[in-house]
Design a protein with these regions (language model features):
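Active-site-adjacent structural elements in enzyme catalytic cores
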Residues: 1-141
Length: 141
């Protein structure tokens, strides 16, 4: 399932949660059994991934539940300077946060609705998915 989604939507605004491998330290996943994977469609990030040998570990430049920063200065302010490094590539091209899909269980779950809608995920997989967010909070394209 993860491969089907990755082939269809990457690079792009889709985060796929998969079961973490045993060798992945729990500090990377916050103690959770799943890990979110994403390949964004942003040239600077894609080049950084390439220069790092194919993968990097990171989080978004925001606190959970808050909007993502749109600039390096805003990220520093939001995170109270508690970061080791910021790569300032100019204003963020981001808009709506990525769609998050969890493929760790028997049924695929959409954890957050983003630019990719549930019907697009179902079409790519050829099976129904469970939408966890309340429908009233779903933003349409």
């Amino acid at each position: 399932r993860a491969l089907k989604l990755a082939r269809k939507f990457w690079p792009g605004p889709l985060t796929i949660i998969v079961k973490k491998k045993e060798h992945i330290p729990s500090v990377v996943t916050g103690g959770k059994e799943g890990i979110g994977l994403r390949i964004p469609n942003y040239e600077v990030t894609l080049k950084l991934i390439e220069l790092c040998g194919g993968a990097i570990i990171g989080t978004s430049a925001n606190k959970s539940g808050f909007k993502a920063a749109k600039s390096a200065e805003e990220a520093l302010r939001i995170l109270n300077g508690k970061v080791d490094l910021i790569l300032d590539a100019g204003p963020s091209p981001g808009g709506v946060p990525s769609t998050i899909v969890d493929v760790t269980g028997d049924m695929v779950k959409i954890i957050r609705i983003g630019p990719i809608m549930p019907n697009e995920i179902e079409e790519a997989l050829g099976e129904p998915v469970e939408v966890v967010p309340k429908p009233s909070r779903i933003k349409r394209k």
